[in-house]
Amino acid sequence: MTLQFVDPENYETLLAAKKEHLNKQFAIFNPPALECFASPKLHYRMRAELRVWHDGDELYYIMFDKKTKQKFRVEQFPPASELINNLMPVLLELVKSSEILRYKLFQIDFLSNLKGQVIVSLLYHKQLDDNWLVEAKRIKAELLKQFDINFIGRARKQKILLDYDYVIEELQVDGNKLFYQQIENSFTQPNAKVCEKMLEWAIDCTRDSQGDLLELYCGNGNFSLALAKNFNKVLATEIAKPSVESAQFNMAQNGINNVTVIRMSAEEFTQAINGEREFYRLKEITLSDYQCNTILVDPPRSGLDDETVKMVQHYDNILYISCNADTLSRNLEVLSKTHEIKRFALFDQFPYTYHSEAGVYLVKR
């Protein structure tokens, strides 16, 4: 995405094109009317990753054009939060003033939240020592006069924290506040305002549900915690250890006690639920204690594997959140044989790109 395509005046036209494309692609499944949730036109991304270019004494941010592969200089990054844009030039000037901080620096990552917290990760092609730490603390102290900021230094097999490596996001969802720990260098929803709308849509889809919820690919508990109030119990799976720990942190932060998170992949859980394998990680969990009538899946771009699709078909209600319309369509070729689409949504997580985040709610025929 080159920055000239970030065109707020053309946003509605581009969104209409996404809606038209999604409607055409899924017409074969005869879904209900598409619900569309727009993004803020600017400053919608809570994170950004920018390369750093060295040119003599000069130092500046760059990005690469995906088509031409040519680098271009970046002074501001309109998709990123206003906080990140305000910080970018101030941070760069301080880094430029320090030979220790600028030497072998090749990338700066930003992770912000709606409350004004920001984590800055400085990535290096060198090992970091005590001299680096002294300089990092110096510029942090300077930036704390203007920003609620923390720093991380990264190099090969090295990570140095200046206090902590996460922000606490606060989302307004269905009349309630939800708090989420979001850890640097792990997956989080990039578009906070669209995430709020996505969670509210999922809550509305499942509002009168019976029994329990099973969620695969739960991440940091983004959906599990928001939907917990609609179910007796929630059983959630996630393969990434930092995300599991973050989900447990978030449960405590929000006072939610009817969610259980287990560390295993969707494929492993399919084997467990089918009785094909026993897992030590499930030794304290009796799967028969859960009466899961509803399943939520939010898979990676590759979608659901064939065995997981078959397992998902056993549930009365399926809530499928997808970041890849092509794999969603492929999975629906099977799921639509046993289930009917009752809700169909587009969440514009990634404005000015071809990517569409979609949601479908299916009920067994």
Curated annotation (Swiss-Prot):
One GO biological process this protein is involved in is:
tRNA methylation
Q: What class of enzyme is it?
A: transferase
In its UniProt entry, the species of origin is given as Psychromonas ingrahamii (strain DSM 17664 / CCUG 51855 / 37)
Arranged from A to Z, the UniProt key words for this protein are:
Methyltransferase, S-adenosyl-L-methionine, Transferase, tRNA processing
For this entry, the protein name equals tRNA/tmRNA (uracil-C(5))-methyltransferase
Name the domain of life this protein comes from: Bacteria
- Which amino acid positions bind S-adenosyl-L-methionine, per UniProt? Q189, Y217, N222, E238, D298
What function does this protein fulfil? Dual-specificity methyltransferase that catalyzes the formation of 5-methyluridine at position 54 (m5U54) in all tRNAs, and that of position 341 (m5U341) in tmRNA (transfer-mRNA).
Which CDD domains does the record associate with it? Answer: AdoMet_MTases
Q: Name one GO cellular component term.
A: cytosol
| Catalytic residues of the enzyme | C323, E357
| Similarity annotation | Belongs to the class I-like SAM-binding methyltransferase superfamily. RNA M5U methyltransferase family. TrmA subfamily.
